[in-house]
């Protein structure tokens, strides 16, 4: 097999691959054995006609399509491996020369992982991240715990107030006509949370269970759904239920109820310790992010669009999974946020670009500094993951696919590259 590699613009590589005639003949024979039953030839039962007869009757090229697929796939995989080419998309195949007894010649044009030009990456200067947990931080955490332990009580003797939790049915109309995505039943809303369009929640104040309320709002000019942007709308709302949070008193009894401590002061001290540990953890990661951000900013790389689109695909899938855990799906979320799918994807584009650039730069640093990941490190990380899933290590390993192992390896490599950059940075 002969391979010629030519680098084109925009991270495109074109390979011209020449495969020996004998290899192509083997593939044609395989194609005949696979497809012979599909052809009808007078004088022969279906699938019993010799290859030469079928070719004479239907033409020499009758078995070429599958043969080309077989040969090109194998030759392409071998060519990119031997030439250290790292595709990020499927190749476009073009046949240049084909025929009986002749070498098969084809080109494969493919987008490849871009080259990274590192700028300054050792000795970058960043400011130290200070850790400071205040009394206000402790009080805020106490209030959050109190919120979680609040009793939710139905309210019947007064109207809706800010902070109340209401259960409502609603349907929206524009010019007297209902619109798509404007209707829901049993929707639970905290009044004053700003979940809905400006003005919607305020007009619920004073309502009681069983009330029918007409809410008039205007969709923002920059609303995601263009057909609704800037238009006035009427929502017919039925109040099903009104509840209020009753917060517990924050005292020694509260501390006993929610913790292992007997006094509020002891509980506060434990909160301060927990917040300090969390703040130190955040500070460490913030420092790492600052260092990496400087190194990434100093680097140059031209990222192909296909890599960005695939990163966005991955981000959308992850986002949808998180929404599913909350009992939502992406369509419902987009309706609530008032944006369409393409707008949502566009909002992710810059982050996708930055994530890919960060990954590529860290890979380059690891390569330049000869940072490696050992089998032992992969094994240790797999064991940690297994424990997080309450699985035995050996059972977990049995379920690992090659791409799972590569993901674990990449995660360790990036962490080691980040550690290297932080160790070699100037912390001011």
Swiss-Prot record:
Entry annotated with the keyword Electron transport: no
Taxonomy, superkingdom: Bacteria
InterPro entries: PPIase_dom_sf, PPIase_FKBP_dom, Trig_fac, Trigger_fac_C, Trigger_fac_C_sf, Trigger_fac_ribosome-bd_bac, Trigger_fac_ribosome-bd_sf, Trigger_fact/SurA_dom_sf
Molecular functions (GO terms): peptidyl-prolyl cis-trans isomerase activity; protein folding chaperone; ribosome binding
Entry EC no(s): 5.2.1.8
Primary residence: cytoplasm
Catalytic activity: [protein]-peptidylproline (omega=180) = [protein]-peptidylproline (omega=0)
Signal peptide: none
Biological processes per GO annotation: 'de novo' cotranslational protein folding; cell division; chaperone-mediated protein folding; protein transport; protein unfolding
Record-stated family: Belongs to the FKBP-type PPIase family. Tig subfamily.
Function: Involved in protein export. Acts as a chaperone by maintaining the newly synthesized protein in an open conformation. Functions as a peptidyl-prolyl cis-trans isomerase.
Record remark on domains: Consists of 3 domains; the N-terminus binds the ribosome, the middle domain has PPIase activity, while the C-terminus has intrinsic chaperone activity on its own.
Identification of the protein by name: Trigger factor
Native source organism of the sequence: Acetivibrio thermocellus (strain ATCC 27405 / DSM 1237 / JCM 9322 / NBRC 103400 / NCIMB 10682 / NRRL B-4536 / VPI 7372)
């Amino acid at each position: 097999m002969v391979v010629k590699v030519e680098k084109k613009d925009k991270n495109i590589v074109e390979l011209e691959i020449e495969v020996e005639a004998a290899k192509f003949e083997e593939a044609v024979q395989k194609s005949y054995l696979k497809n012979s039953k599909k052809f009808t030839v007078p004088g022969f039962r279906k699938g019993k006609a010799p290859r030469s007869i079928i070719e004479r009757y239907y033409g020499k090229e009758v078995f070429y399509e599958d043969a080309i697929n077989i040969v090109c796939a194998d030759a392409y995989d071998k060519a990119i491996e031997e030439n250290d080419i790292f595709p990020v998309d499927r190749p476009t195949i073009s046949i240049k020369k084909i025929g009986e007894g002749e070498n098969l010649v084809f080109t494969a044009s493919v987008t490849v992982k871009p080259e990274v030009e590192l700028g300054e990456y050792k000795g970058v200067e960043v400011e130290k991240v200070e850790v400071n947990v205040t009394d206000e931080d402790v009080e805020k955490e106490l209030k959050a715990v109190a919120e979680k332990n609040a009793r939710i009580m139905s309210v019947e003797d007064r109207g809706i107030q800010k902070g109340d939790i209401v259960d409502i049915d609603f349907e929206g109309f524009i010019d007297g006509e209902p619109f798509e995505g404007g209707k829901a039943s049993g929707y639970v809303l905290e009044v004053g949370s700003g979940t809905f369009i400006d003005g919607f929640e305020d007009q619920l104040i004073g309502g009681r269970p069983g009330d029918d309320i007409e809410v008039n709002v205007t969709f923002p000019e920059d609303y995601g759904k263009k057909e609704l942007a800037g238009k006035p709308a009427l929502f017919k709302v039925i109040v099903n239920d009104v509840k209020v949070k009753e917060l517990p008193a924050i005292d020694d009894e509260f501390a006993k109820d929610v913790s292992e401590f007997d006094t509020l002061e002891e509980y506060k001290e434990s909160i301060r310790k927990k917040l300090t540990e969390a703040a130190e953890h955040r500070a460490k990661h913030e420092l790492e992010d600052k260092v990496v951000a400087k190194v990434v900013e100093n680097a140059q790389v031209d990222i192909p669009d296909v890599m960005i689109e695939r990163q966005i695909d991955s981000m959308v899938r992850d986002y949808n999974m998180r929404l599913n855990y909350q009992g939502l799906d992406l369509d419902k979320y987009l309706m609530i946020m008032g944006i369409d799918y393409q707008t949502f994807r566009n909002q992710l584009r810059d982050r996708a670009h930055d994530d890919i650039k960060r990954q590529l730069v860290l890979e380059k640093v690891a390569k330049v500094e000869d940072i490696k990941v050992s089998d032992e490190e992969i094994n240790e990380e797999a064991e940690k993951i297994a424990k997080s899933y309450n699985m035995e290590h050996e059972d977990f390993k049995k379920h690992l696919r090659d791409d799972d192992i590569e993901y674990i390896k990449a995660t360790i490599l990036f962490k080691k590259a980040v550690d290297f950059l932080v160790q070699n940075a100037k912390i001011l």
